[in-house]
Amino acid sequence: MSTDELAALPWRLDSPLSAVPSAVDAQLKEYLSRSQEEFSPIGSLVGGAITVLNHFIVNGGKRVRPTFAWAGIRAAIEGGGGSPDALCGKGGDATSSSSADFNQGAILNALSAFEFIQACALIHDDIIDRSDTRRGFSTAHRTFESKHRERGWLGSSGHYGVSQAILIGDLAFAWADDLYNGSGLSATALQRARPAWRAMRTEVIAGQILDIALEANGSEDVADSFAVIKYKTASYTVARPLHIGAALAGANEQTQSMLRNVGQDIGEAFQLRDDQLGVFGDPEVTGKPSGDDLRTGKRTTLINEALRSGGEPQVAALRAGLGKGEDSTEADIERLRDIIYDTGAQAKVEKLIEARTQRAIESLQAGGLGADITAELTQLAEKLTHRRF
């Protein structure tokens, strides 16, 4: 079945995890279209900025967070102590037309809200990292910068680009709350999940603050880079979406705790894979320039492990070569890759990925959930932690 056909199906409480991305895409397009209309009276200058945000959200993205939130909902209902009644506050028969209609709008609104937080995080992260491309397109701040330059406007094009990108990122963060709290899910369900929703928003920002501070103080401690992974990525990418979905559907505390732990392991493995791809990935597949972490000198777990494991000449060469920005040639980047590989860091990080993925899968299989959601979550964990993009 094609993604378009999946998106057209009525949403049911047993809809597969694989159906989430296309369904969320359709929901996002509908919400963004309405939002664009709301801004039209203000004028084209604001409307143009909203168009950049719309393009950023609609084009690309794996919809990982909505998928895990849906997994949390299904896990709660399929053996985790939850129910459709707890989620919707009415009905409970997901095959009835009224319940299906309610679920399709309310549930997909709540799932789609995660993508606005992700948009804010990525737009701001690209500014912080001075990135030029994202998902094969120009980053938001570079897009605004180019428009300013092309039109011959006053002032600094770079400052204009950063300023506008900050604002549309802030807007995305606000829209996340609007869409989530106005989703149509029951007030009781939203209240039950509110602590986890609030924690997720705080953790991702705290993780970014920590990341910037550690970069500034020059920390090369693997424990520090893992702390960034925990809060900036693992918690808000996997652990909290699973937690929020389970809480919305009324999962018992045992299931919620198990899913948080599973999510933390998958999320850490997901980010460790991202660190590997940032150095060794194929730009044609990832959509991002290879070696950016080497050019910026970002102390990821992979790089910190290389600095810890390497011999004195290797460590000296890494420190001399990291963070040279655009002065780094392709030959320089390739040399750094070779050094990192030779220290054994790449192999050690690969083992960390495998250990966390396996622990998550074993916890899922022992978690008492239904066979279908256990199998789908296992497959998703393996897909994300062994990806090439």
Question: What are these model-derived regions, one by one?
Answer:
Residues A106-R135, P195-I205, H243-A246, Q254-P283, ...:
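Active-site alpha-helical segments that house and flank conserved acidic catalytic motifs
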Residues I77, C88, G92-S99, G245-Q254, ...:
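C-terminal helix-coil-helix/basic helical segment that borders enzyme active sites and/or dimer interfaces
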Residues F68, A176, G207, I303, ...:
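Residue-level signal for inorganic ion chemistry
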Residues M1-L111, A119, I123, R130-G158, ...:
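Conserved N-terminal diphosphate/IPP-binding helix and adjacent helical/loop segment
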Residues A71-I77, W175-S183, R240-L248, A306-G310, ...:
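Well-ordered alpha-helical scaffold segments within catalytic/enzyme domains
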Residues P41-G43, I57-R65, S163-W175, N181-F280:
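All-alpha helical catalytic cores of prenyl diphosphate-utilizing isoprenoid enzymes
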Residues E334-F389:
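Short hairpin/turn module used for nucleic-acid contact or packing/dimerization
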Residues R135-G169, G218-S235, S257-N261, P283-S309, ...:
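Divalent-cation-assisted or electrostatically stabilized phosphate/pyrophosphate-binding catalytic cores
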